[in-house]
């Protein structure tokens, strides 16, 4: 059986997604208990697509025979039905830890990558490179053959050989134990034909303009298995009677606006012809522009990359604003959003801010919106590198491995997890006081008396540096009595601090410990400091004060750290590992921690990536940071 193939084409804003949903809804209404109807969209669009489909089905058919999938969810469903879903999927954290472990094991065999092993973020770059090679089905044999090519010499040749070595070890370590998304995609292509729910299914594919070789292999199998496949592509066409001509300059030129979509159409057509040389795909062209209702926006959509001379259009649909700094730009956006909401009746959910350079602008837009009381949602995962718990683990581990230096000890103390302040019932100068003020007192004391070593922090004798400077006959004066009371309280404080740190140091410094034992020591350290109850208290306080992003961070960070610990044990559990190597594994894992933020409600401004977002129903869009080198992006 060969599937019927239909391309739904049209320029941006012509309603291709609406056409897919309407066609799917009509099919479900006509045959509610028939074959499966599947909508395949990019991963970041699955939620929005499910919601739109549910809204279109509200007064008609149900979801019984309908699925909304990204490739990841499709792979999971097929593997559940055909076998292979039992293997745990390695997380990004786990992959980075595993790659770091492989690099450390092969350190003596590497000559090019050895210089980068200790560099921050290298395992992330390496992991993404390997994933990209697997998506393009470039095996280690291909890499080695390329390395031996006479046209490739020196450093590049050696780099390819080392990359092949790392990929082989990664595959061997994961074989039968772990899987990742690229491996699941290979299994999806191999097992798709055995999935009962895909036999004779009708499939709509929307939101893509390109498919990598792994995805093309999946389409090859879908053309064998499904009954009908509808694929929407953003490109232009020209109607000539009953035919649609697509070989237009904007499509066929390598620099054409729709060249990528046209090449995808040709590649998919060639796949279909491989199966059935007589097959001819249908083309459904949508020409009417629905999104750009204003004349100026419609003209820009048509001529942004053209050379036609445009007559001036005064409809205020497009404004160009220049500011001196990104901070002023963020404040101007916040101010204008307030104007729209107050004076023109816009809802916040109808407004979006599109950002190309998220690292720069997220940290400026969020406080600017907070100052104006504008509810907003950052539609991107936020690194949790600087969350107090991540900082505690990093600083405490460095204290254990590098010695109890002033910087590392006080970095750990300022996270807020240590029992700095005594219990209210204790006869202590700092009981019931501000813990940050107490840490300031302790820091000043350590600076004044040069306390910088583990031996000084863990000394059994009391700290009495102040008392040594006070003559016996003046210790009863009010001023000196306070100084002595402060010193006694600081001594009790350092003992409460030193006890858990000292135990952690003993476990982490041992040369004969396994990764499991070192990870257990970190967990016991967090348990001794009551980190989980503290995070819960912080979360409740943040919720009560309306700081929903902070509440989400406190809620997720514990689970993220437990995942990190599990991956550390999974990768190197019973192997003896040096303190240095474990420190590097932990550091890489902490760098990979991320927090997914939850929208604060139904009515909020969305801050989203310019490259990848799932925005729909937006009436106003602010595009910030439109600078040379950023848009279009240099390189």
Region locations from a protein language model:
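Polyanion-engaging groove/track-forming segments
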Residues: 1-635
